[in-house]
């Protein structure tokens, strides 16, 4: 892909139609279902995409289908993202499926021990949901807070249950 070119690809998931924006640097954003994503052209066998783009889409679909998947292989296009948010997203990507961290844990891990609220703000504007697994970040004492995906906190809780996160058990992400 040439410098500054981008590709937007929509695909169907259990949550609805999601989309990714991909550039020469990698994944630039993930869009969770909305009226706007429903109108985009869908991924098909006829659409020419790289193996990395296809693997990223397959990984996101797998996670939203209830399959535990590790998406740390996905290259991120972080141009325009400030160093603090980059650090938050990098730290969040280290949280493996089945694990959780608090906003305070992330803040301490990036050298900002009093920055839990700033971490929360950074994750609230996470342009890479699912790939940067903000659903694995919880409030102090494991309290569920903020999640912008359809279904909000209930979806966050189901995703954590599916992954077997401590205190959340395991359960099917979406029932029939």
Predicted feature locations:
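Short glycine/serine-rich loop segments
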Residues: 114-155
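Active-site phosphate/pyrophosphate-handling residues
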Residues: 87, 129, 158
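Basic nucleic-acid-binding alpha-helical/helix-turn surface characteristic of O6-alkylguanine DNA
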Residues: 1-114, 162-176
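…primarily DNA-binding HTH/wHTH and HhH modules…
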Residues: 140-176
């Amino acid at each position: 892909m040439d410098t500054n070119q981008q590709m937007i690809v929509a695909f169907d998931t259990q949550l609805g139609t999601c989309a990714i924006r991909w550039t020469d640097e990698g994944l630039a954003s993930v869009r969770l279902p909305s009226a706007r994503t429903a109108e985009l052209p869908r991924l098909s066998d006829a659409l020419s995409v790289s193996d990395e783009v296809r693997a990223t889409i397959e990984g996101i679909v797998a996670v939203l289908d209830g399959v535990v998947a590790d998406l740390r292989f996905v290259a991120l296009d972080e141009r325009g993202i400030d160093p603090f948010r980059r650090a938050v997203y990098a730290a969040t990507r280290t949280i493996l499926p089945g694990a959780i961290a608090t906003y305070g844990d992330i803040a301490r891990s990036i050298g900002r021990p009093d920055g839990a609220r700033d971490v929360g703000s950074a994750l609230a504007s996470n342009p890479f949901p699912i790939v940067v697994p903000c659903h694995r970040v919880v409030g102090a004492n494991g309290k569920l807070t903020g999640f912008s995906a359809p279904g909000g906190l209930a979806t966050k809780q189901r995703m954590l249950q599916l992954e077997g996160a401590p205190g959340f058990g395991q359960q099917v992400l979406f029932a029939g």
